[in-house]
């Protein structure tokens, strides 16, 4: 697709298995996975992000009395240190990607949109 925004999934071997990072076109890591025990499981996690991120609902847990959305969904929340984060849950409720901490809510929301845009057509390295 000409003109499509394309990020990339980078698979890394770590001490206890494999994980992936989703990087935006500028090379910045915008979401990361848990550690999977085997590479095929990690690749399945990537496929799940590619399938779920573009259609996921947005559940803003920062709003008092927020509406609980159906999976798949992005959950935006504040962590214990007061930073804003998001996690992407698959249809089965499993967390398949998480963000770094952001100082501003707007930056966190931009991160969600970046995952939506960059994941669907992303290449895997």
For the regions a protein language model found, what residue spans apply to each?
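A structural feature that tracks compact, well-ordered secondary-structure segments
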Residues: 8-14, 19-36, 45-49, 73-103, ...
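A low-complexity, Ser/Thr/Gly/Pro-enriched, surface-exposed linker/loop concept
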Residues: 39-66, 107-125
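Intrinsic disorder/low-complexity detector
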Residues: 2-15, 51-80, 122-124
């Amino acid at each position: 697709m000409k003109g499509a925004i394309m990020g990339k999934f980078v698979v890394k071997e770590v001490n206890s298995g494999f994980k992936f990072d989703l990087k935006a076109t500028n090379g910045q890591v915008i979401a990361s996975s848990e550690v999977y025990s085997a590479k095929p499981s990690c690749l399945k996690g990537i496929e799940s992000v590619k399938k779920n991120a573009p259609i996921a609902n947005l559940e803003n847990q920062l709003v008092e009395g927020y509406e609980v959305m159906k999976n798949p969904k992005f959950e935006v929340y504040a962590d214990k240190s007061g930073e804003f984060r998001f996690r992407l849950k698959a249809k089965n409720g499993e967390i398949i990607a998480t963000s770094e901490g952001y100082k501003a809510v707007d930056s966190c929301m931009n991160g969600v949109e970046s995952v939506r845009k960059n994941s669907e057509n992303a290449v895997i390295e």
